């Protein structure tokens, strides 16, 4: 086993890569273990690509209401679902590459695979068994591979996963998680969004603007329950 890292971080999301960069800037020998995509869920399958989708929806809305702004648009306004999705994935991929650049610039080693803490101070990295989400971002260049790695300190920053509600298990067809909602083959005629947090409202807003009939189901007394009542109203 090579010389131990001062800090080894499991997870290359916003918690992991930011900690890694700061540790390296402070002079610590640092590595990040990632099994799927640098930048984590937020950058690849969360708030970043949803903002790109919402931007397309916003422009579509403005074009359909051009006359409200004293503008004239000839012909019918339409959209290409695959192009809308492709743009959002391109935005995500660009920022994903940016995370890889920042890690390289700050001399943080990137170890590609799935980590297991074997014992205190030792992490085993094996090829990931998790199927990659489609379309996947390319694996960054210059990474380290599977094997055993020693570390004086280990940070676990493994991020978020979709919640599964008993009896409403996702099948990727009729019942989606946010993964499928972000890369639809076509836009559904109707959609029920379970949960009115930030992610739920983002998807509800996007799909409704693009012409889908949307209903939001929330167990708590207000939408956006984690926010101020004034915002929820």
Per-segment meaning from a language model:
Residues 174, 185-227:
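Rossmann-like NAD(P)H-binding beta-loop-alpha module
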Residues 11, 90-91, 195, 227:
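Residues that cap or flank secondary-structure elements
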Residues 6-32, 200-208:
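N-terminal Rossmann-like FAD-binding beta1-loop-alpha1 element of flavoenzymes
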Residues 2-13, 187-197:
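Beta1/beta-strand and adjacent pyrophosphate-binding region of the FAD-binding site
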Residues 2-5, 21-28, 33-187, 220-224, ...:
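Glycine-rich flavin
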């Amino acid at each position: 086993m090579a010389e131990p890292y001062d800090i080894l971080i499991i997870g290359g999301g916003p918690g992991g890569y930011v900690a890694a960069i700061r540790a390296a800037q402070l002079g610590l020998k640092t590595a990040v273990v990632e099994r799927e995509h640098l930048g984590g869920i937020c950058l690849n399958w969360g708030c970043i690509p949803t903002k790109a989708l919402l931007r397309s929806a916003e422009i579509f809305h403005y074009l359909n209401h051009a006359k409200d702004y004293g503008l004239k648009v000839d012909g019918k306004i339409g959209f290409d679902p695959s192009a809308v999705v492709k743009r959002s994935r391109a935005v995500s991929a660009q920022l994903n590459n940016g995370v890889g650049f920042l890690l390289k610039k700050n001399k943080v080693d990137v170890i590609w695979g799935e980590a297991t803490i074997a014992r205190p101070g030792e992490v085993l990295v094996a090829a990931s068994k998790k199927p990659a989400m489609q379309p996947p971002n390319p694996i960054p260049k210059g990474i380290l591979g599977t094997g055993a790695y020693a570390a004086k300190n280990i940070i676990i920053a493994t991020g978020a996963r979709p919640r599964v509600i008993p009896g409403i298990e996702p099948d990727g067809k009729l019942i989606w998680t946010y993964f499928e909602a972000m890369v639809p083959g076509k836009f559904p005629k109707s959609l029920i969004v379970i949960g009115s947090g930030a992610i739920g409202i983002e998807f509800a807003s996007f799909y409704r603007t693009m012409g889908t009939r949307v209903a939001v189901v929330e167990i708590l007394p207000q939408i956006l329950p984690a926010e101020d009542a004034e915002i929820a109203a």
